[in-house]
Regions:
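An anion/pyrophosphate-binding glycine-rich loop and adjacent beta-alpha core
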Residues: 299-301, 305-443
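N-terminal Rossmann-like FAD-binding beta1-loop-alpha1 element of flavoenzymes
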Residues: 52-77, 564
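Conserved redox-cofactor binding core of oxidoreductases
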Residues: 15-16, 20-22, 27-31, 135-242, ...
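Glycine-rich loop(s) and the adjacent beta-strand/alpha-helix scaffold that form part
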Residues: 241-320, 543-545, 549-558
Length: 569
């Protein structure tokens, strides 16, 4: 039977619902947030015109500009950074089925397997056309850049085709998740310097060689038009503080995310805001959420023109996710908590799997353990951020040498890390017995007894080939039985993980046209990269590391194709 409660403010009524409390807008959510405000009314000096105006010279903006220019269009590329200060965050790019991999013998991957895996991880919240472009066009875009515009000596020196050889015993799927090969990493192997900011400048030079113009130190402020009218340009603020208007037939916004804007981050990143609240922090305080990224100006410009933000939960790049310690050589390993017991399925190592680790109290001990068979165990692992690139022969040899020359004791020893292509090292701890290893990592009393008993129990499950406790993938059940024994360990901070950049942005259609709330396109306005929403759905995920940069490059290229077609070229 249905029970009706007497109605009043917040009192439950039929079916468990309740009356609205009549909260005033200023105490709740605003359709025009304070960080957005009203579109400014600026007096700007006209400063040229073009067929295509592209705002932002990052990954998406650069490929968009280059693709439009080679089609014969007059293109202006505007970038808020000056030429001297220009930088790009990352150098990892997942772009599948490139000749860089295929020519080395890497098997071609079925693009539909890639597409379906990403859509599954996004729980259907991403735009299928945009994700399909990422899955099917990446190799084409990377080959286009490398074959046509990037000097061969730069590709030879810096383009590292991660895991192109594969891994001897890896099945391709771990704990139900695919792991694909396809990340190119642009790094100098000796200095550990990210070389992509240097290499992308060769694309800028090629763009200028095709007649394109780059406006450095041009901060985008507002679009011209929108709200029922065609977008016909944008207003910028130059390095001298003067407002300049550039007119165009089409504008492509590629100005990056809002992760570097504390107010937008607090308001728009519902995941981060509410994660902070779950830690007892003030979710109205911008200091409760941290992160990195751009200033959100491209998104604000689109919103002033009538665009809407994609729905939530809004994906951040690893926002709210903490992982287990890991070894210098990567991989998923048995992990033991502060009480000496396992507490998770370690083979679920991709972004989006470990977020609950944020729920552990401060100073919780986390310990990864393996034994002398560590390299054999590595041959069963996939290709994510957390895994060893066994295609880098010189790095493999150095790791083998480091591990061969292990030093027992509490001081540990250095092992070359596989997180990046360069000279990075991490501590590994060694002991001749598990009892000694327990002392080194800090287990005492009951926790030490639990740890030794848990290892014995874990080894029994490895022998049986089934993890009946946590469901670790059988190919990753690595017994801890042969000395020497190795560990890595750390303690939790109980701090909210801000992750990297934010991937939520404005709603677009499958042609990268920015949409009004009724999902009709805003004439003359396109978006790519982190200005383009619905690329990730609810969370960033890594069947291959580097798909954020890869997606940006691909979306810029594909958006440009649609622009070229719309202009009849």
């Amino acid at each position: 039977r249905i029970v009706y409660a007497a109605k009043g403010d917040g009192v439950l009524s039929a079916g468990g619902a309740c009356d609205a409390l009549g909260i005033a807008p200023e105490d709740f959510m605003l359709n025009v947030p304070a960080w957005l405000g009203e579109k400014p009314a600026l007096e700007a000096e006209e400063d040229g015109s073009c067929d295509v105006l592209i705002i932002g010279a990052g990954n998406a903006g650069t490929t968009a500009a280059l693709k439009c220019a080679e089609s014969g269009l007059k293109v202006i590329l505007a970038e808020t950074q000056t030429y001297d200060e220009y930088d790009e965050y990352a150098c990892d790019m997942a772009m599948y089925n490139s000749k860089l991999f295929l020519d080395k013998g890497t098997p071609e991957i079925d693009p539909m397997d890639i597409f379906n895996e990403y859509m599954r991880l996004y729980r259907g919240h991403a735009h299928q056309s945009i994700v399909r472009d990422f899955a099917t066009r990446g190799g084409e875009v990377l080959d286009w850049m490398v074959d046509t515009y990037i000097p061969a000596e730069y590709t030879d020196a810096y383009a590292k085709t991660s895991n192109y050889k594969g891994n001897d015993n890896f099945s391709g799927i771990c704990a139900g998740q695919y792991s694909f090969r396809g990340m190119t990493q642009w790094r100098d192997v000796d200095t550990n310097v990210n070389m992509w900011p240097f290499v992308i400048r060769t694309l800028h030079t090629a763009f200028e060689g095709l007649g394109g113009e780059i406006r450095w130190g041009y901060q985008g402020i507002e679009l011209v038009g929108g709200n029922g009218e065609a977008v016909t340009g944008a207003v910028f603020k130059d390095i001298d503080g003067a407002y300049k208007q550039v007119n165009a037939k089409v504008v492509i916004c590629c100005a990056g995310d809002f992760g570097g804007n504390p107010d937008m981050r607090l308001d728009l990143s519902d995941q981060m805001r509410n994660l902070a609240w779950s830690f007892g922090k003030d979710r109205t305080d911008v200091a409760s959420t941290m992160g990195m990224g751009r200033d959100g100006s491209g998104i604000r410009m689109c919103l002033w023109a009538g665009a809407t933000m994609e729905g939530g939960p809004r994906a951040g790049q690893a926002a709210g996710i903490n992982g287990v310690p890991g070894f210098a050589f990567g991989g998923a390993w048995p992990c033991f908590g502060g009480d000496g017991k396992r507490f998770m399925n370690e083979s679920l190592i991709k972004h989006g799997s470990n977020g609950y680790l944020d729920m552990l109290p401060a100073d919780s001990l986390l310990v990864n353990v393996t034994d002398s068979n560590w390299e054999t165990y590595l041959s069963y692992q996939g290709y994510g951020h957390e895994t060893m690139d066994r295609s880098s022969d010189y790095m493999v040899e150095e790791v083998r040498e480091n591990m061969k020359n292990y030093v027992t004791g509490a001081d540990g020893f250095d092992v070359r890390a596989f997180a990046r292509f360069g000279k990075e090292y991490s501590k590994v701890y060694a002991a001749e017995t598990l009892d000694e290893l327990a002392d080194i990592v800090g287990y005492t009393g009951e926790a030490k007894k639990n740890f030794l008993a848990e290892v014995a129990h874990y080894n029994e499950m490895c022998e049986a080939g089934k993890d009946s406790d946590w469901g670790c993938d059988p190919q990753n059940l690595f017994a801890i039985k042969d000395a020497p024994f190795f560990a890595s360990f750390s303690k939790t901070s109980n701090q909210v993980s801000g992750g990297l950049c934010q991937h939520a942005a404005v709603c677009t259609d499958g042609s990268y046209r920015v949409l009004y709330g009724d999902k009709t396109p805003i004439e003359g306005l396109y978006a790519a990269g982190n200005n383009c929403g619905q690329r990730y759905g609810i969370q960033y995920a890594t069947p291959t590391a580097g798909n954020s940069c890869g997606s940006a490059l691909i979306s810029g290229y594909c958006a440009a194709e649609h622009v070229v077609e719309s202009l009849g070229k």
